[in-house]
Amino acid sequence: MMNLSRRTLLTTGSAATLAYALGMAGSAQAATAVTARPGVPVTAAPPLRLASRNSVFTRSGAGPRYWNIYGYSFPHNAPIPENEWKANIDWLAGNFADFGYDIACTDGWIEGSSRTTGNGYITSYNDSWQHDWAYWANYLAARKMKLGVYYNPLWVHRAAVEDASKTVLGRPDVKIADLVVPGDFFARDIGGNQLYWLDVTKSGAKEYVQGYVRYFKDLGVPYLRIDFLSWYEDGRDANIGQVNAPHGRANYELALSWINEAAGEDMEVSLVMPHMFQDGSAELANGDLVRINADADKGGWDRLSGMRQNWQDAWPNWANPFCGFTGWSHRNGRGQLILDGDFMRASTFASDEERKTMMNLMVAAGSPLAIADTYQQIGNNAWVYTNKEVLQLNADGLVGKPLYRSATPFSKDPGSRDTERWAGQLPDGSWGVALFNRSDTETVTKTIDFAKDLGLATGGNVRDLWEHRNLGMDSRATAALAPHASAIFRVTPPKMHGTTRYPAAFAAWGGGAGFNNNHPGYDGNGFVDGLQAGSGSADPLVTFAVQVPHRAATPSGYRYANATDDNTTSKTTTKKANPEKADRSTVDGPVHVSFPGLATWDTWGVAAGTITLDAGLNLVTIGRGATDKGAINLNWIELDM
């Protein structure tokens, strides 16, 4: 049988607060000073319509930490033997589980798993394995870890199709063979003949897909990696060409919606190899994680930063994670998508500085932290995965963005976003800041100016997280970086009059809202526009993660511009974010906040109000609902905590 592994198939406020905030505006961005205007709360506001899956996983911020078999299977081009799987789990439990890497996940090379349940669901990773999924889920649980599974619920194994006794779960009248079209094999045009693609138009198809997802959930699997989605949608690979029959956009969206529904709040859905057509709308609506670059492959600097730099309208849109994270950063953030930069193979890099850059990038972008080195490969490189201060950024939910220079998409203008300078705000108001040198030859100095780039006119206390050293109060984070080197800092601004400011330019954007800087007078590097009426099925919104010590009615300020004819109203919704299903309830609202009209779009004012926040982590969403009027640009929100 031809080995069609996933890797071989791929070729390669207060008045005082307001006065302070406006007083800090630089002369180059002078704005008309406007006195604070009270917000007018109306408790009858309907909820916002969402474009995203908005699961407990994405609302929590950054991706999970786990280990994957890829470091064994890619070099061997073979499924991992069960004894090697066990040895790596034991190594993981002894060395990394205490650092939060608590999932062991399979990967490709899956065609050799042909033993199925009576409903056609595979019972183990490979036929050569003695033990089934349940055994390994229990083995991991005994070590306070969990089982992650790589499999696509749209696959139907040939062995199940050819067994007339196999029927669809809950549909004994439908045989597994009835779910496929003869010859519609995954990778058919390049030799695939073991896995069929499911025909989602067939009776029983929905039950099969959702039964597959629930089958894994019942085994205690919290994380499902679903691969080769582009090949299902249109049957094409950007490097290979036609690989199998296309199944169409409508069927693709339908299949993803079934998976989303079945996964619910109990399973994290990782979408791998999607084309991300229509700006990733289908993936946003139905997934938690989405792959944004080519496979880790042999690892090393070339896979991290080299290879193709330009965009293509097919998976992978960008080849390396620096560009992929940057290009898709408008889709990241709480309640939106977790961008997945694929696996980390520290042992494949040429220097410790490159290894730190690998880790810094994944953490800054909010990616999952997926170790793919094995116990035999790791050598003396485990340290890069276990820096507690760096990992704390991930634990706090850091999802950074590159510095934006304009609203032009990165796919159209690679100069519109800076791949080497990243920042993201944490719920307590502190920041994670990362600087990179992607040059192969030049030592360069990289800087983020806190006032100009982040809107922090007061500066902040800077701590170097690899040096474990406080650098003191400063107006910037800066580092002289050798080729391939990087630095990552935690920046803690002082609280002024008890307030904490959250810039919209570093929040999560949805429903058509996005970055802009085409009007002067804003604080920081820009603002969010698009908070206006639209023709789509989702409302534009901005979401901020906010940490408070106790439940309280919290004075709030919203710096905005509004030159429409109407007094603009925009919903403010406060939600409690917690990775527990029962804790998804609304804390306050939705309520309306009034944004009175101003002279021009270059005039900025602050609307004042009060919202209730709960103790712990809250998600505060400002959105333009269907019953609202007018439009605003939003610069920041400020909370008196």
From Swiss-Prot:
Bridged cysteine pairs (disulfide): none
Enzyme Commission no: 3.2.1.94
Listed Low complexity bias regions: 561-576
Cell location: Secreted
Active-site residues, record numbering mapped to chain: D227 (nucleophile), D288 (proton donor)
Region of interest (Disordered), ranges: 556-588
Keywords: Glycosidase, Hydrolase, Secreted, Signal
PTM entry text: Predicted to be exported by the Tat system. The position of the signal peptide cleavage has been experimentally proven.
Enzyme type, top EC level: hydrolase
GO molecular function: carbohydrate binding; glucan 1,6-alpha-isomaltosidase activity
Reaction catalysed by this enzyme: Hydrolysis of (1->6)-alpha-D-glucosidic linkages in polysaccharides, to remove successive isomaltose units from the non-reducing ends of the chains
Any one GO BP annotation for this protein: carbohydrate metabolic process
Basic and acidic residues composition-biased segments: 577-586
The keyword tRNA-binding belongs to this UniProt entry's keyword annotation: no
InterPro entries (alphabetical): Aldolase_TIM, CBM6, Galactose-bd-like_sf, Glyco_hydro_27, Glyco_hydro_27/36_CS, Glyco_hydro_b, Glycoside_hydrolase_SF, Melibiase_C
PROSITE patterns to which the protein is assigned, alphabetical: ALPHA_GALACTOSIDASE, CBM6, TAT
Domain CBM6 positions: 500-640
Signal peptide boundaries: 1-39
GO cellular component entries: extracellular region
Pfam families the UniProt entry points to: Melibiase_C
Family the entry assigns: Belongs to the glycosyl hydrolase 27 family.
Record protein name field: Isomalto-dextranase
Taxonomic source organism: Arthrobacter globiformis
